[in-house]
Amino acid sequence: TSPAMRATALLTAEAMPGFRDWLLRQYPELAKAAGRAADKGGLNIEGVAWDPGNSTLLFGVRCPVGATGIPVLRVRLDPGAGWSVDALSEPDTLYITNHQAGQGIRDITHDPVAGGFLVLLGRSVSGDDVPFQLCRWDGVSTAVEVEAELPNRMKPEGVTVIRAEAPGRALVVGDAGSFA
């Protein structure tokens, strides 16, 4: 934990030892991809969100994406337990199926205003010519609703909700020094 975080005691940050190994044991279909470079179809998780309604962590997979759809790894976490893999249980996978070929999850965030999640979809590997889209997802179904098409030159990487009450706003940031 950094000195700044220790000083405030409002937030702590620490690694969860053994998490990667635990994750790959729970999702054996991803283990093969974990040994490859991201742009060669390797495992690339870019989005993470907390689902307060289900006490689950959602991990958005950028790559690999198969015929089943874009995987969202859902891992139940006991927030009152110690910070170790022993606090994790009941993993499962949801799939977003109404996406364009070559898309993966670039980010995912809980939307406390409208409920559900905002999901940023884009290239699963660098160089693919697929659209970047800001989507709304209910966290349960296999479908997302496209809220906005974003310019490829923006290279969107992150999204967050600004306000916790209506009207909410979303901020999207990109690699090219841009935001929307």
Spell out what each predicted region is.
Residues 1-180:
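Sequence/structural signature of beta-propeller domains
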